[in-house]
């Protein structure tokens, strides 16, 4: 490619500016003489930093080209496999597509949990670096850091309004944050070991937490007092999640079981024992999934007329299981991940399940046909957490590679 005289002149001036501003005086004077440049102040200003700017914009363009090539290849793939690119996909069937929209760095240790805000276009991430970070998922901008924990932050949870954020940590505490003023409202002490999971109950009055001390505790938001303790697990309790109306909570543990508890009485309603290793994660099925689950499992509607509730669990045995809690039965097992399953969630549309694992992938499951329909190589290291936005077409993932990635769905 041949440069015009004007382009050559511009390039020479930009090189001269670069040599001079970086202290290569000798090279600068020789180059200036050989290129026959007469540098004056006005020109100097015009060419200041130009070479670096060109250089970075070339890198940016290369990245964009690679992204577009990747999108084009995906479109070709869908076209040849007769995928739904011609007809418009129903948003209920949108799934995350590579490449990621943003790869965000800022955490200095593995990312442990990622969640979307229920109202605003922000997401929150927790990390082993003892911080919680807030990001705008639409622009990819970092907004702020919440500091207070003194050890790895293990889990975070919003109330339904998004005004309160709960966090828990290996420092054995639970913190409640005002998400409008971004200050810590109170700190709850009571667990005797690493607090691995936290969730604000649907009514917003209570918080549940799970710990390596083998217990689950319920706390009053207003006072910070512990009002209930659920005991029964024989090992570290990894995760606790309330169902939609807050009458039940599910928990999973290193004892390889999933338990479902009745909140009012503290009794264990079900103990589910089919996993063959530590159960890392659980997720309740939204009502939007009930009809697909019934089709998939052929389970007739119960006499009471209402199906479910259903629960997902993901384990270090590399499988995902779906359970019908009303009968305490495993309805299906999804096999495909090559390593520990770390996160599992229903697609808001109800037709798919998303999971992430230590095999560095996100997988999208068409569970009606019990098959993995898409695998995304998501991170450079274990994928620890994922969240699917309830209304906007975004998925967020966090990883041991210390990055957070935002994926657009279409």
UniProtKB/Swiss-Prot annotation:
Ranges for domain LisH: 7-39
Q: What is the lineage of its organism?
A: Eukaryota, Metazoa, Chordata, Craniata, Vertebrata
Give the InterPro entries listed for this entry: Coatomer_complex_subunit, Dynein_regulator_LIS1, G-protein_beta_WD-40_rep, LIS1_N, LisH, PAC1-like_LisH-like_dom, WD40/YVTN_repeat-like_dom_sf, WD40_repeat_CS
Q: How does this protein assemble? A: Can self-associate. Component of the cytosolic PAF-AH (I) heterotetrameric enzyme, which is composed of PAFAH1B1 (beta), PAFAH1B2 (alpha2) and PAFAH1B3 (alpha1) subunits. The catalytic activity of the enzyme resides in the alpha1 (PAFAH1B3) and alpha2 (PAFAH1B2) subunits, whereas the beta subunit (PAFAH1B1) has regulatory activity. Trimer formation is not essential for the catalytic activity. Interacts with dynein, dynactin, nde1 and ndel1.
**GO annotation terms (biological process):** brain morphogenesis; cell division; endoplasmic reticulum to Golgi vesicle-mediated transport; establishment of mitotic spindle orientation; germ cell development; intra-Golgi vesicle-mediated transport; intracellular protein transport; microtubule organizing center organization
UniProt subcellular location:
Cytoplasm, Cytoskeleton; Cytoplasm, Cytoskeleton, Microtubule organizing center, Centrosome
Q: Which organism is it from?
A: Xenopus laevis (African clawed frog)
The residue stretches assigned to a coiled coil in this entry are 56-82
| Entry's Gene Ontology molecular function annotations | dynein complex binding; microtubule plus-end binding; protein heterodimerization activity
Question: Organism's domain of life?
Answer: Eukaryota
Instruction: Present the record's domain note.
Output: Dimerization mediated by the LisH domain may be required to activate dynein.
What functional role does this protein have?
A: Regulatory subunit (beta subunit) of the cytosolic type I platelet-activating factor (PAF) acetylhydrolase (PAF-AH (I)), an enzyme that catalyzes the hydrolyze of the acetyl group at the sn-2 position of PAF and its analogs and participates in PAF inactivation. Regulates the PAF-AH (I) activity in a catalytic dimer composition-dependent manner. Positively regulates the activity of the minus-end directed microtubule motor protein dynein. May enhance dynein-mediated microtubule sliding by targeting dynein to the microtubule plus end.
Under the heading PANTHER family, the entry gives: COATOMER, COATOMER SUBUNIT BETA
CDD domains (alphabetical): WD40
Give the UniProt family note: Belongs to the WD repeat LIS1/nudF family.
Q: Which SUPFAM superfamilies match?
A: Lissencephaly-1 protein (Lis-1, PAF-AH alpha) N-terminal domain (SSF109925), WD40 repeat-like (SSF50978)
Which UniProt key words apply to this protein? Cell cycle, Cell division, Coiled coil, Cytoplasm, Cytoskeleton, Developmental protein, Differentiation, Microtubule, Mitosis, Neurogenesis, Repeat, Transport, WD repeat
Q: What is this protein called?
A: Lissencephaly-1 homolog
Spans of the WD repeats are 106-147, 148-189, 190-229, 232-271, 274-333, 336-377, 379-410
Q: Which GO terms describe its cellular component?
A: 1-alkyl-2-acetylglycerophosphocholine esterase complex; axon cytoplasm; centrosome; COPI vesicle coat; cytoplasmic microtubule; kinetochore; microtubule associated complex; neuron projection
């Amino acid at each position: 490619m041949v440069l015009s005289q004007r382009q050559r002149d511009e390039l020479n001036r930009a090189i001269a500016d670069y040599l001079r501003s970086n202290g290569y005086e000798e090279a600068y004077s020789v180059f200036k003489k050989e290129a026959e440049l007469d540098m004056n102040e006005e020109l100097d200003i015009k060419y200041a930093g130009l070479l670096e700017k060109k250089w970075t914009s070339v890198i940016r363009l290369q990245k964009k080209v690679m992204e577009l090539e990747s999108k084009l290849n995906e479109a070709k793939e869908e076209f040849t496999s007769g995928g739904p690119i011609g007809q418009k996909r129903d948003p209920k069937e949108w799934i995350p597509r590579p490449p990621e929209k943003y790869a965000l760095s800022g955490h200095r240790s593995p990312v442990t949990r990622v969640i979307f805000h229920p109202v605003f276009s922000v997401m929150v991430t927790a990390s082993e670096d003892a911080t919680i970070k807030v990001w705008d998922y639409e622009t990819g901008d970092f907004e702020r850091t919440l500091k207070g924990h003194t050890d790895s932050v293990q889990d975070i949870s919003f109330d339904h309004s998004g005004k309160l954020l709960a966090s828990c940590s290996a420092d054995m505490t639970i913190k409640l944050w005002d998400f409008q003023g971004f200050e810590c409202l109170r700190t709850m002490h009571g667990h005797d070991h690493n607090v691995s999971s936290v969730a604000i109950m649907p009514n917003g009055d209570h918080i549940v937490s799970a710990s390596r001390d083998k217990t689950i505790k319920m706390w009053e938001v207003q006072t910070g007092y512990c009002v209930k303790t659920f005991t029964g697990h024989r090992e570290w309790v990894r995760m606790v999640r309330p169902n939609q109306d807050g009458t039940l909570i599910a928990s999973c543990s290193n004892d390889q079981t999933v338990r479902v508890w009745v909140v009012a009485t503290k009794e264990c309603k079900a103990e589910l024992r089919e996993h063959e290793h530590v159960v890392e994660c659980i997720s309740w099925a939204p009502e939007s999934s009930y009809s697909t689950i019934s089709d998939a499992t052929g389970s007739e509607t119960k006499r009471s007329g209402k199906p479910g509730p259903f629960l997902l669990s993901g384990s270090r045995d590399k499988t995902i299981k779906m359970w019908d809690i009303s009968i305490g039965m495993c309805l299906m097992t999804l096999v495909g991940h090559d390593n520990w399953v770390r996160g599992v969630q229903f697609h808001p549309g109800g037709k798919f399940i998303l999971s992430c694992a230590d095999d560095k992938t996100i997988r999208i499951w068409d569970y009606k046909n019990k098959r993995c329909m898409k695998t995304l190589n998501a991170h450079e290291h274990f994928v620890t957490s994922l969240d699917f936005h309830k209304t906007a077409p975004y998925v967020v993932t966090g990883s041991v590679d210390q990055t957070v990635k935002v994926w657009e769905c279409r």
